[in-house]
Amino acid sequence: MKKLLIASLLFGTTTTVFAAPFVAKDIRVDGVQGDLEQQIRASLPVRAGQRVTDNDVANIVRSLFVSGRFDDVKAHQEGDVLVVSVVAKSIISDVKIKGNSIIPTEALKQNLDANGFKVGDVLIREKLNEFAKSVKEHYASVGRYNATVEPIVNTLPNNRAEILIQINEDDKAKLASLTFKGNESVSSSTLQEQMELQPDSWWKLWGNKFEGAQFEKDLQSIRDYYLNNGYAKAQITKTDVQLNDEKTKVNVTIDVNEGLQYDLRSARIIGNLGGMSAELEPLLSALHLNDTFRRSDIADVENAIKAKLGERGYGSATVNSVPDFDDANKTLAITLVVDAGRRLTVRQLRFEGNTVSADSTLRQEMRQQEGTWYNSQLVELGKIRLDRTGFFETVENRIDPINGSNDEVDVVYKVKERNTGSINFGIGYGTESGISYQASVKQDNFLGTGAAVSIAGTKNDYGTSVNLGYTEPYFTKDGVSLGGNVFFENYDNSKSDTSSNYKRTTYGSNVTLGFPVNENNSYYVGLGHTYNKISNFALEYNRNLYIQSMKFKGNGIKTNDFDFSFGWNYNSLNRGYFPTKGVKASLGGRVTIPGSDNKYYKLSADVQGFYPLDRDHLWVVSAKASAGYANGFGNKRLPFYQTYTAGGIGSLRGFAYGSIGPNAIYAEHGNGNGTFKKISSDVIGGNAITTASAELIVPTPFVSDKSQNTVRTSLFVDAASVWNTKWKSDKSGLDNNVLKSLPDYGKSSRIRASTGVGFQWQSPIGPLVFSYAKPIKKYENDDVEQFQFSIGGSF
C-alpha cells in the first residue's frame, strides 16, 4: 500500500498530510535531470538512511517552492523511498526583440536583464507579461497608443525556453484639436504659440504628433508665460486628453485660472546671509520695480544669490521667494528668504567615468583646490575647462556630502569620454583636380595624459607629404605647453591642374612654447627650420621676380630658413568639439631670422564665434573670419611657395583645394628667355587672403535631443578672396596685350562665394564630415568641387 506524504504552499501557508515517520533507504527526484536534480538533492535536509518526519517533508516542499524555480512541488513515500516530484519552470536560453525602432534594442535588453529575463534566469511568465505591459505604457506616453508588445515563449527540450518580444510601434496619434478655457486676458492663439505640439494641419510634418512628455513641457511653457507676464497666481486647473475610438487622434482641452496681473512693488533680502549682506543687496538692482512682475527675473536673482554665496563656500544655500499680494492695487512685494547654511570645505576632488584619461590629467584643469573653502565659481570653471579639452562628450559635476561631517564635501566630476584617437581617410573629387587622398593618425589624449600625437599624410597624383606632431599641454605645473613638428613634403606640381609647375622637396622641424595669461588668453613663441629644394620649374613671371630678388643662378633653388613664430590665442568656447557658445580668436606671425636665405614674414588673424538662439543650444549661429598677409623684406621677395591659396573644406567649400588665387603667367619658352605671354589656369597664389563663413547650425532631423551633441548639421555661406598687394608694381614688366587678358590680381574684391549644407558626425568609428556646396560667385576657369567628404575610423 502506498502511503502519501503531501505538502504544498498555498497563499504562503504550508499544509501537510501526516503519516508515520519512516527511514528513507533511498531518495528519488522526479521531473528533472542533470545539474538541477543534483542541486535539489544537495538542498534536502535529509539523506538516504535517515529518519524522515512530516516536518522534514513540509520543509522540503516549502524551500523548493519559495526558490521560485518550480511551478509545483510534491513529496510522498513509496515503500521505504522518499520521492520528491517537481515541475520546473523553464530556463531562459535566448532573448530576442523585434519590431522596435523608437526604443533602442540595447535599452530594452538592459531592462529585461534588470527584471530577471537574461539568459540563464528562470522564466516567470507573470513577470514577463508585466514587463510587456510596462513597455506598452511607455509607448502610450509618447503618443503611440496603438503600439503592441507581445511576449512570445517558445518551449524547447531540456526545460529551456526562448523569449521573443514582438513589437509593433505603430504611428503616433495626432493632435486633432486644442481648446483653451478660462483664459479671459490672454488669447488662445497666444497660449498656443507657447506650445511645440500643434493641431493637425496639412503643413505640419512633425509638430502635430501627440506625445505625453512634450505635452507636459508645453504645459510648463504656458505656466511660464503667465508667470513672466504678471499673472503670479495663474494656474492650469485641468487638462482633458480624449482619444478617438481608433486611438489615432487626440483632442485636448486645457482649463486655466489666470488671476490678476501684478506689478512688482518692492523686493528685499532677509535671513541668514552668511555675513554677505553688502554683496547680496546690489543683486536686487536687476529687478524692474513698478513694472510687470516676471518670475524669470526673480529666478535669476535667486540663482545670483546662490552663486555669490557659493563663491564664499556656502555650497548648500537655499533661497525661497515669498510674495505679498495687494489685489486692490494689483501689486506684489517679494521677500527673498536666504539660508546660507554652513560654510563648506572641499575634502577631495574625485572623477568618474574617465577610463582612459588619468586623474592627474583631469586635475590639471581644476581650479578648485582640495582642503580649501568650496567655491562654486571655481568648480564650474573646472567643468568648463574639461569641456574645452575636447576629450569628453559630456561633463557633469556634483557635491557629495561626507558621512559624519556637516561642513565637508567632495566635488565629483562625472565625464563621458569620446574617441580622441582617429584614423582618418579623406577623398575629394574636382572637375579639374580629379581624386585626391588624405590620411592621418591622431591621438589627442595619448595614454590618457592629455598629450596630442599625430601622423598626417597626403597622397595624390602630384605629391606626398608627412607630418609628425606632438603637443604636451602640461609641460610645467604652471600650464606652459610644449609642442613640436617634424615634416617632409615632396611635390611635383607640374602634374597638378591647379598649381604652377615645379618640383619641390621640403623638410624641417619646429618647436613651440605656450604660456597661459588667464583662463581665456595665452600666447606662444617658437623656433623652426625649413629646407627647400626647388627644381624643374618652368619660367613663370611671379617666380622669376622672386629668383631675381634672391640672385639665384642656374635652374635649381636651395634654401635654408630659420624662423621665429609668435602669437596670441583667446578661447571662451564652452567645449572643445562641436561648441555652441563662445569665441575663439588668434593673432599670429612668423618671420625669418638671421642665418636664413630668405627674408619674409607672414601675419594671420582668425576669429570664430558661436551664438545660441535657444536655451538648449540646438539652434546656433556661427560666424568665422580669417585674414593673412605676407611679404618679403630687405630687397627680397616672398617665396612663391609661401603664397596663399583658397578652396576646399576649411576655407571655401564648393571649390577644389588650393584652386583659388592669382594665376601663373609662363614664358613662351619655359626654360629660355622668352617673354611672359602664356596665361595659365595654374594657381601661383597671392600674398593676401581673407575668408569668411556664416553658418546656421540646426537640429539634425530624426536624431534625439540626447544625441544632438554628437552630430552637427548646418546651412552655410562661404566666401574668400586671394590677391597680390604688389600687383600694381609687379605688372609693369608685362606686355600690354597680356595685361588686357588678365584680371586685376591686385583687387581684394575678386571674391568667390558658395552656399550649401554640411553634416558632421562623431561616430563610434570616427569622425565623418560631408558637405555639398554650390558656388554663387565664381570666375572663369575656377575648379568647382561641389561634394566633399571625409571618413575616419577611431581607436
From Swiss-Prot:
Its main location: membrane. It comes from the Bacteria. Pfam families: Omp85, POTRA. Gene3D superfamilies: membrane protein fhac, membrane protein fhac: a member of the omp85/tpsb transporter family. One of its GO terms (biological process) is protein insertion into membrane. Keywords: Cell outer membrane, Membrane, Repeat, Signal, Transmembrane, Transmembrane beta strand. GO terms for cellular component: Bam protein complex. Coiled coil: none annotated. The keyword Transcription regulation does not apply. It is found in: Cell outer membrane. InterPro entries: Bac_surfAg_D15, BamA/TamA_POTRA, D15-like, OM_assembly_BamA, POTRA. Residues 1-19 form the signal peptide. Residues 22-89, 90-170, 173-259, 262-341, 344-418 form the POTRA domain. Part of the outer membrane protein assembly complex, which is involved in assembly and insertion of beta-barrel proteins into the outer membrane. NCBIfam families: OM_YaeT. HAMAP family: OM_assembly_BamA (MF_01430). Part of the Bam complex. Belongs to the BamA family. This is Outer membrane protein assembly factor BamA.
